[in-house]
Amino acid sequence: VTAATTKFSKRNSGQFAKLGDVCVRAAGAVPGNVILFFPSYTVMEEVHKQIHGKITKELLKEHPNMSKEEKQKLLKEFKNTHLAGGVLLAVIGGSFSEGIDLPGTLLNGVIIVGLPLGQPDLETKELIRYYDTRFSRGWDYGYVFPAFTKALQSAGRCIRSETDRGVIVFVDERYAWESYYRCFPSDMTPKMTEFYEEAIKEFFRKKEPQSHNL
């Protein structure tokens, strides 16, 4: 879905409103549980302001510096909402983006909001320089690919076995750019569409045990 972006230079109230609208519509079209993954807590909080009160499902949210017990409690609460449907807001690269198991109908959809491309820190800059010197592709190997891998790992929470079925929605105009689109693995070919709500509903009307990427 290319209707909005989390690109730092374009962040403003209008952009967050667009992101919120996509999240409300996409999450509402998925029956049962959905996880919204964000590139940072800052973006998550801004979008939360936009969707609070507009999503009929129960909203749960990851917080910075949560203890192991708090994370386990939040995960249990999320699992318990799967019949009526719940929406968990979490951060790409955080505890809920890796190492959790939500098989079957415990998770029917994942929405990746934006790309986790922050300001390069010293370590990242060193990696960029190293890969530039060695392969002349420092920006790709040291910055873009690691961020994209984190986004894909978060998306992978939705499909953990051959019998799982669910929808993965990538929300950001940059996913359509050639420089980023080529980062998707060969077995994942997202479809660009403005009509994502209907595409999601149509997927769940069918019975094929596979994932659908938007």
Give the residues covered by each predicted segment.
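ASCE RecA-like P-loop NTPase motor cores
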Residues: 1-214
